[in-house]
Amino acid sequence: MKFALQINEGPYQHQASDSAYQFAKAALEKGHEIFRVFFYHDGVNNSTRLTTPPQDDRHIVNRWAELAEQYELDMVVCVAAAQRRGIVDEGEASRNGKDATNIHPKFRISGLGQLVEAAIQADRLVVFGD
């Protein structure tokens, strides 16, 4: 089965990101495909490379990045939600006069059209969070 995932919550204030990660990992290990992972609303906070959790806590951003590396996942961050929360790549930093970027290199910023395409291409769109 081909899945698309939508994550609407940040990495440390809600269990949605952890649940989505565990779902994705289990699905991929069982041979299913994930067409795209789309981070929306507060879920865009899963993409910042500046997250630094305590050593005894899980690093959900790195977990997502490692899963993306292992399975060549398309990890898309909503541009509007990212801008509102200060998540920028080089293009957005340049367009908005920012002097730094903070998106993890395994993620990319794009628009809601990517979510629509994922919903069309996948057999199921699974949404995590409110």
UniProtKB/Swiss-Prot annotation:
GO molecular function: sulfur carrier activity; sulfurtransferase activity
GO BP: sulfur oxidation; tRNA wobble position uridine thiolation
Pfam families: DsrE (PF02635)
Keywords: Cytoplasm, Transferase
Active-site residue list: 78
Superkingdom: Bacteria
Any one GO CC term of the record: sulfurtransferase complex
Subcellular location: Cytoplasm
Broad class of enzyme this protein falls into: transferase
Gene3D superfamilies with a match to the protein in the record: DsrEFH-like
InterPro entries (alphabetical): DsrEFH-like, Sulphur_relay_DsrE/F-like, Sulphur_relay_TusD/DsrE
EC number: 2.8.1.-
Primary location recorded for the protein, binned into one broad class: cytoplasm
UniProt function note: Not known. Could be involved in the oxidation of intracellular sulfur.
Protein family according to the UniProt entry: Belongs to the DsrE/TusD family.
Protein name, per record: Putative sulfurtransferase DsrE
Species annotation: Allochromatium vinosum (strain ATCC 17899 / DSM 180 / NBRC 103801 / NCIMB 10441 / D)
Name of the encoding gene: dsrE
